[in-house]
């Protein structure tokens, strides 16, 4: 009798799973014939099962690919996803502004949220709706101008530590020495987010070369995410497949376990400090006036003065630790790497910047002193424009909607359209890098690295709905990068210290360098894929006359 009951349950479960899979398959197969996007122009699909997805994921120069599509099909068109389904591609500034300002109606796709939750938990980057607003509201105080001003000392200190790290390398091998700079930059920015985010020194830039446990976890994580894999996509679409054991998931789980263990240690230690200070004298309380991210979150969480709706649960606090460990150092380290690459391609720009940096009478500038350097500002802006660390973002419509456009398009029936109708579930691709390098917005020299352009930018650029500097690198709206001020000032501090201290040349022919996107756009060398992402430079100490 028990056997019969168990068999019936298993059969019922199998039938339910089969029904879900069948419904999903039928929905996908009929989608191209009923899609509201079917009459948009667009590039022909290179593959029925994969559409344009593999091409977009593996493109060496995604900006050039997107710009070629825009030149041929306009700023708004359709492209192909899985199994012939249609997706919306738009670089139209009015459309993008609308999507960003209606974040309740346009969420990250299921596959993105599944991947982010798998790695980060339910942190700020992976949640939507009310939960996102709650987390963002509590975290905003950590990233205001006053807070970043107080953290600049950490940025400068760790930038000097990186200079010392590289000088040590040069003393061993002579000058100019070949140094893979991405590794050092990643360690430096990890140390920064440790101190500024959690008041914890990871000491990644240790000269004895001992591997840092957290850095090793990151390396495992990003190696696991490398490449175009079908299974994670299927797991996002068909949740029962997430139960399947696979090597990639096991490696990610192992790396995440390390990140979360360190996160719990940080939270436990900080909680103990806050509780001890609460029952101690004023002197002890003054020691906890730190406004690092973790202190602010835990003070908010432990305070009885705040209404329940403004507090984060312990689970939500824990989710922010890996979120900011990854987001707080990966984007900045790669942005500075691309900045150094750009400076190797134009020695005049490099020297002009160096001359300005040496005009500052201190090697330990404040945030205000960094912000008063116009050419440094221009170089940082141009780096973030031309080499945006995150080259694109994607959203899914949560309801049927109509999106108005700045630039009309001609549909495949020859009719002019000034809006796009989307249906619930439609994917929308926003090409950050293509908008940053659009010739229609920036002029014919849009692909050139030209800091002088910031002396007078075109009027059309004012329509770009980014939170910073009329570009999309930090997005806009409710999901704009909460740490953009943090990132910009940290980047300035790094460039200030490095370019004052060293001269840089590319160690390989420029044609060998390429970009590899694993969430973040990283430099890599053709023919050296086994060495992972890297930026080898020839470095020598700058000797001022």
UniProtKB/Swiss-Prot annotation:
InterPro entries registered for this protein in UniProt: Cyt_P450, Cyt_P450_E_grp-IV, Cyt_P450_sf, Cytochrome_P450_monoxygenase
* Swiss-Prot/TrEMBL cofactor(s): heme
One Pfam family of this protein, by short name? p450
Pathway, per record: Secondary metabolite biosynthesis
The record, for Gene3D superfamilies, names: Cytochrome P450
- What is this entry's stated membrane topology? Single-pass membrane protein
Q: Which UniProt keywords apply?
A: Glycoprotein, Heme, Iron, Membrane, Metal-binding, Monooxygenase, Oxidoreductase, Transmembrane, Transmembrane helix
What GO cellular component is one of the record's annotations? membrane
Q: Which subcellular locations apply to this protein? A: Membrane
**Ranges annotated as spanning the membrane:** 9-29
Q: Where does heme bind?
A: 481
Q: Which domain of life is it from?
A: Eukaryota
Functional summary from the UniProt entry: Cytochrome P450 monooxygenase that is able to use carbazole as a substrate for oxidation.
Q: Provide the protein name.
A: Cytochrome P450 monooxygenase 197
Supply the source organism for this entry: Postia placenta (strain ATCC 44394 / Madison 698-R) (Brown rot fungus)
């Amino acid at each position: 009798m028990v056997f019969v009951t168990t068999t019936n349950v298993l059969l019922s479960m199998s039938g339910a799973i089969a029904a879900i899979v069948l419904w999903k398959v039928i929905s996908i197969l009929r989608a191209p014939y009923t899609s509201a996007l079917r009459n948009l122009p667009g590039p022909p699909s290179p593959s029925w099962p994969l559409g344009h997805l593999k091409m977009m994921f593996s493109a060496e120069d995604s900006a050039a690919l997107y710009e070629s599509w825009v030149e041929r099909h306009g700023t708004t068109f359709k492209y192909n996803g899985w199994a012939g389904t249609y997706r919306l591609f738009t670089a139209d500034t009015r459309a993008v502004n609308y999507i960003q300002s209606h974040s309740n109606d346009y969420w990250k796709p299921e596959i993105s949220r599944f991947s982010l939750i798998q790695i980060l938990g339910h942190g700020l980057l992976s949640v939507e709706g009310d939960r996102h607003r709650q987390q963002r509201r509590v975290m905003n105080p950590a990233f205001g101008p006053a807070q970043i001003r107080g953290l600049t000392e950490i940025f400068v200190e760790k930038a000097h530590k990186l200079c010392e790290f590289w000088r040590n390398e040069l003393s061993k091998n002579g000058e100019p020495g070949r140094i893979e700079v991405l590794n050092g930059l990643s360690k430096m920015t990890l140390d920064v987010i440790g101190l500024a985010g959690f008041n914890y020194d990871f000491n990644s830039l240790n000269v004895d070369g001992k591997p840092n446990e957290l850095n090793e976890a990151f390396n495992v994580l990003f190696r696991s995410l490398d490449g175009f894999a079908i299974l994670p996509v299927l797991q996002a679409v068909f949740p029962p497949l997430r139960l399947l054991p696979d090597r990639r998931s096991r490696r990610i789980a192992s790396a995440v376990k390390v990140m979360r263990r360190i996160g719990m240690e940080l939270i436990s230690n900080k909680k103990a400090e806050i509780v001890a200070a609460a029952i101690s004298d004023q002197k002890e309380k003054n020691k906890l006036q730190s406004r690092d991210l973790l202190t602010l979150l835990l003070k908010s969480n432990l305070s009885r003065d705040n209404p329940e709706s403004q507090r984060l649960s312990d689970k939500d606090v824990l989710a922010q630790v890996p979120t900011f460990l990854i987001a707080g150092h990966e984007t900045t380290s790669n942005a500075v790497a691309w900045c150094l690459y750009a400076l190797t391609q134009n020695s005049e720009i490099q020297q002009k910047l160096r001359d300005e940096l040496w005009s500052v009478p201190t090697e330990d500038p404040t945030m205000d002193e960094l912000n008063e350097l116009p050419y440094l500002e221009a170089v940082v802006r141009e780096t973030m424009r031309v080499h945006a660390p995150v080259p694109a973002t994607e959203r899914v419509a949560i309801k049927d909607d109509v999106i108005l456009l700045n630039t009309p398009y001609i549909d495949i029936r020859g009719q002019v359209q000034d809006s796009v109708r989307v249906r619930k579930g439609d994917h929308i691709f926003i090409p950050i890098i293509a908008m940053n390098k659009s010739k229609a917005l920036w002029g014919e020299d849009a692909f050139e690295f030209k800091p002088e352009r910031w002396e007078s930018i075109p009027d059309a650029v004012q329509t770009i709905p980014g939170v910073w500097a009329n570009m999309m690198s930090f997005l806009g709206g409710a999901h704009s990068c909460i740490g953009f001020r943090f990132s910009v000032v940290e980047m300035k501090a790094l460039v200030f210290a490095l370019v004052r201290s060293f001269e840089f040349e590319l160690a390989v022919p420029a044609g060998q360098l390429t970009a590899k996107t694993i969430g973040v756009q990283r430099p890599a060398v053709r023919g050296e894929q086994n060495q992972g992402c890297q930026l080898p430079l020839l470095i020598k100490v700058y000797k001022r006359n």
